[in-house]
Amino acid sequence: MQTKYEELEQLRSKYPDFSPFVLLKLSMIRYGARLTDAALDRVQDPYYSFGAVEPFGIDFVGRTEKRAMPGPILLRDSSNVYINYGENYSDPYDVDWDEDAGVFFLKEGDRIIETVDFVPRPAFFGKKTSRGTPMEALADVRAQLLILTAFQRCRFWEKGDQCAFCAFFTSGHTMGEVDCQDIYEMIHEAIKEPGRFSEIHVSGGTDFTGEPPFELEAERYIRVLQAIGRNFKGRFSSQLMCPAYPKHLLKRIYEQTGITSYCPNIEVADEALFRKLCPGKEKWVGYREWIRRTVDAVEIFGKGNVYTQVVTGAELAEPDGFRSMDE
């Protein structure tokens, strides 16, 4: 059986013009990574410790409230890899701390694959808003990116229409709709750290309430984006990650806030699998309408400012997905 290292070497040989760090990142996302006891001890240091609060409301079986988790893993090319620490991976890499060398190593068994580090703890973590809300409960951090959750629930779960691969807001510890004053104060504090953040993303669970559907959700995003905007003059580097809205809602959001880009995540590229794996999105928008609205959004946000994302691996979902990588 081929090892992860052998697989990486084969890919690097096959694709010599492809960044070896991107290949490593893809491999780490595929296989996952586990913190050794030595690494977990080391990341309790305040420089690394992100704490135990999970702003997307997910309970990972391998985590404990008594032990803080680090942020994303940093590679030597300055890119970062987000890992769900505590997930039950079947064949993960190990991240180990070498006391003698004073560095973290990514390992497969005893073989050292790469020298790695972790994104440092943001300066605003550990602080509270004037309402007493922990600031780290309001945003997740990816190196220089802040990701805010405007609505820490997803209404697709109410009737079993949630996306099949999603675990967001399932821990029971989330706060529902966030407070706009909390958001303003958290952003105000976060941007005090020189050069730390370059972009703000706003996301959250889906709320189809309103007539037409998503009307109230759009109004919520407007309030949150306006609260963020109080910290800036004019538009600010940002992205709204939400359902595919009709043009009239998107136009309101764009005109009333400082948002600069839009990302309605289709999640699954295949139409039949989309219907099966994303029943809520199919019910309230539909696959083809999702694509049409995404394309239409370019008229509002401009070329190069509209995105989407897919969930890697969904195309292999049984029984309707591809049966092999070759297929």
Positions of the model-derived regions?
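Alpha-helix N-cap and loop-to-helix initiation/capping positions
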Residues: 178, 182, 213-220, 281-289, ...
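Flexible, acidic/Gly-rich N-terminal and inter-domain linker regions that tether
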Residues: 1-154
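Catalytic core of soluble alpha/beta enzymes
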Residues: 259, 263-277, 281-291
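Conserved strand-turn element in the central/C-terminal portion of the radical SAM core barrel
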Residues: 235-245, 279-283, 294-326
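Alpha-helix initiation/capping motif
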Residues: 49, 179, 246-247, 270, ...
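Active-site-proximal beta-alpha loop/turn segments in soluble metabolic enzymes
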Residues: 203-212, 272-279, 309-319
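Conserved Radical SAM active-site core
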Residues: 95, 119-260, 268-272
